[in-house]
Amino acid sequence: MLTLDTLNVMLAVSEEGLIEEMIIALLASPQLAVFFEKFPRLKAAITDDVPRWREALRSRLKDARVPPELTEEVMCYQQSQLLSTPQFIVQLPQILDLLHRLNSPWAEQARQLVDANSTITSALHTLFLQRWRLSLIVQATTLNQQLLEEEREQLLSEVQERMTLSGQLEPILADNNTAAGRLWDMSAGQLKRGDYQLIVKYGEFLNEQPELKRLAEQLGRSREAKSIPRNDAQMEAFRTMVREPATVPEQVDGLQQSDDILRLLPPELATLGITELEYEFYRRLVEKQLLTYRLHGESWREKVIERPVVHKDYDEQPRGPFIVCVDTSGSMGGFNEQCAKAFCLALMRIALAENRRCYIMLFSTEIVRYELSGPQGIEQAIRFLSQQFRGGTDLASCFRAIMERLQSREWFDADAVVISDFIAQRLPDDVTSKVKELQRVHQHRFHAVAMSAHGKPGIMRIFDHIWRFDTGMRSRLLRRWRR
């Protein structure tokens, strides 16, 4: 069967112009105009999706099948082009009957054209084919427009669903244009309103706990840039102002022995006039033994010295992915569970904004994994937020899973975050030694988010950073009172 793409090529129908007109009409629709005004960050993300729409429409037109009636008419037209005028005159009755049987828009006009001319000349033969071709072009264009209109309605419905989802989640997950773009890409999944309302619920809870949100932001920024010393130290001139004693006659501060003739005491000067003591005077002058006034004074001068200068390079520390382990034991239920899930949502927001990955592992008696920054991130986040914390605590398995993940190439610069109340048994020695090796050799960092003030110090000592968020009633009341 003839495809629409082949028909467009045969009749020289420009499908690109039709596609561009449809996309322009879609972008100018009132629904998108209102949405762009309300969520300007998502405008760029939707605009970046236009090439994908264009390619999808091309593919749809390319694979579309031409109706059998139009296919038969096109084949008849092609055969008629090969006929000479005498042959065309012979075949004309069959051609008119075929057009009538196919209900072609050209059938009535073709019969009128033939009836209006008693003789079929070569010019009439050419005119008949030209008008027939125009009729086929109109039919092909109409078919293209019908298919594009169907695709437009379907695409508009899809975009509206994604706009609804993105509009609901944009205040929660999109902190900048990068995050808005990634959020729009994630919204392509098949989600219902009731599903993503769970994210909205925990987003509202996070806004009610600004200290928890601030804690997540501090953890996300914890890998700051640092200065790295360079070994190629060189000598450079160093200028400084120094203060030193001077002989400026500011005030007399006492007596001293020196050779300063201008500051001689009168008795010393008197010995110079005595012949017997003259040589004694010169001896004491040479030896700087004459009694003189000691004057007190200061002066500032510039002193230039050379010393080795060590330059430091500003090394921006890469901000790698998050590997977050969440304790789902029974002691982490209730308010602790809400805080842990909201904290992970805050880390997801940071990961989207900074183009990082966010990998969640739930540990109790078994390990359950979710990647919140992938193409299915929203669905994964909903599944994670739907989990119930009712298991046991197996912190050792959590660390083993983290260390296994850190050994892969794509996670070598990840930050490991463990969210727990740390009321658990001590870690095995092999786990502790392996964690310390990763910290020492590979500079991996382990963060602890402590949800209780009663966590075991022996367990928490292994972490590089401990971020405390006490969920006890007293701490909750104090935080509320401060707000």
Swiss-Prot record:
Record flagged with keyword Nucleus: no
Record SMART domains: VWA
Cellular component terms per the entry's GO annotation: cytosol
Keyword field: Chaperone, Cytoplasm
Chief place of localization: cytoplasm
Transmembrane segments: none
CDD domains, sorted: VWA_YIEM_type
Entry annotated with the keyword Iron-sulfur: no
Source organism, top-level taxon: Bacteria
Subcellular localization(s) per the UniProt record: Cytoplasm
Signal sequence range: none
InterPro entries linked to this entry: Uncharacterised_CoxE, Uncharacterised_ViaA, VWF_A, vWFA_dom_sf
Family: Belongs to the ViaA family.
HAMAP family in the cross-refs: ViaA
PANTHER family: PROTEIN VIAA
Role this protein plays: Component of the RavA-ViaA chaperone complex, which may act on the membrane to optimize the function of some of the respiratory chains. ViaA stimulates the ATPase activity of RavA.
Name this protein carries in UniProt: Regulatory protein ViaA
Organism: Escherichia coli O139:H28 (strain E24377A / ETEC)
